[in-house]
Amino acid sequence: MDKQVRNTTEIVRLAKQKSKKTREKVDKAISKFSIEGKVINFNSIAKEANVSKSWLYKEHDIRQRIESLRERQITANVVSKPKKSSRSEEILIKTLKRRVMELEKENKKLQNQIQKLYGDLYNKE
């Protein structure tokens, strides 16, 4: 059994080193996306950093960072509509009233045509 002494300290050191490198890749990807203005979400960061999405979700600090950046991007993209001035509202109302009057005239014209056709049909019988 003495020959099979386990070197767990080396395994732990290598695991920490791997985790550190992975974090650096993720930080690089997040920084790159922030600078370039690209969409930051779990899929895009996982793809860019070549890590799994489950790893990103598992690391709470990275998860919170991605979620906060994602929320910040969403709120930045929401643009409020400019309020209409009273003048533009008046113009819109006038335009709509004119359109309604045109449609009413057309409707009346079509109703008269229908009555005439009914009259012609009745006279043929």
UniProtKB/Swiss-Prot annotation:
GO terms for molecular function: DNA binding. It comes from the Bacteria. One of its GO terms (biological process) is transposition. Keywords: DNA recombination, DNA-binding, Transposable element, Transposition. One of three proteins encoded by transposon Tn554 required for its transposition. This is Transposase for transposon Tn554. It comes from Staphylococcus aureus (strain Mu50 / ATCC 700699). The gene is tnpC1.
